[in-house]
């Protein structure tokens, strides 16, 4: 009986060590795969979106494809769900917050992501809106001093925008955050890429400055004539100079910032979800923000 007890204890101990080793190996595979995919996709993000745009033009699509690319990759027995995003084709919450205020920012979230997502907002900004801090000074895009100053980030993580527990409960799944933020960003340049953004994102931004009807006319004019430049559209469709200047601050035709969600799922054990945003400053230096969930 003693021998059986000893052997049983040794077997259990060996099993535990084996499971721990398997867990460590699985975690290593998840981390290695995540970092590899992250590095490759973010490095080639600009080209990937350009190729997709070329394909959309060949197919003569009336509306641009969404500002995200989804794919699934299997590496070493681990499945990686990948969501690559163009951050400059999403509504910049930092730019909206500073230029049009928290109420309009919350409204824009509802317009783009839906009412349940808007109801999950819980703004915890690092600083006050720039306009309030400057006693409602109107920002002018041609002011040299203003151009030299980068808008500080009020929101540096999704936890400063949403009550994440409420958001997950409202949408009913653990992937609530990637789904809710596919057209929202805290890491873009602050200007929405008019060529790549969805109709909803464009209307959310433009209607914060001009009446909804004016934003729709601007969008329709662009859809009718997609070769028209943003400057020409604003010049012909927005008569108020101050509104036109504000829209120039909020809209652009380029993208330089990208992000990636990666959900690494092994056959056993818990999944590993990460979000990484790549942002370039005015000098072209790239900074990465990385979060694990």
Language model segments and positions:
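Compositionally biased linear targeting/interaction segments
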Residues: 1-293
């Amino acid at each position: 009986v003693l021998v059986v007890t000893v052997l049983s204890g040794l077997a259990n101990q060996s099993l535990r060590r084996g499971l721990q080793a398997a867990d460590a190996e699985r975690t290593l595979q998840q981390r290695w795969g995540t970092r590899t995919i992250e590095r490759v996709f973010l490095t080639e993000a600009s080209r990937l979106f350009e190729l997709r745009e070329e394909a959309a033009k060949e197919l003569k699509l009336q509306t641009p494809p969404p500002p995200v690319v989804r794919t699934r990759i299997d590496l070493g027995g681990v499945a990686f769900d990948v969501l690559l995003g163009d951050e400059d084709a999403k509504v910049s919450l930092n730019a909206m917050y500073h230029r049009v205020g928290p109420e309009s920012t919350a409204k824009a979230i509802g317009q783009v992501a839906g009412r349940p997502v808007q109801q999950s907002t819980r703004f915890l900004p690092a600083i006050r809106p720039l306009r309030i801090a400057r006693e409602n000074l109107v920002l002018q895009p041609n002011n040299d001093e203003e151009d030299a100053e980068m808008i500080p980030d009020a929101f540096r993580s999704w936890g400063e925008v949403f009550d994440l527990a409420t958001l997950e409960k409202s949408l009913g799944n653990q992937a609530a955050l990637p789904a809710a933020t596919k057209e929202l960003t805290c890491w873009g340049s602050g200007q929405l890429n008019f060529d790549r953004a969805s109709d909803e994102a464009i209307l959310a931004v433009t209607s914060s400055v001009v009446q909804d009807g004016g934003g729709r006319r601007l969008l329709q004019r662009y859809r009718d004539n997609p070769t028209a430049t943003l400057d020409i559209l604003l010049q012909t469709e927005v008569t108020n100079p101050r509104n036109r200047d504000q829209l120039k601050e909020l809209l652009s035709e380029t993208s330089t910032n990208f992000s990636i969600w990666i959900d690494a799922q092994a056959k056993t054990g818990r999944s590993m979800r990460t979000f990484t945003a790549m942002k370039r400053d005015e000098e072209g230096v790239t900074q990465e923000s990385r979060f694990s969930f």
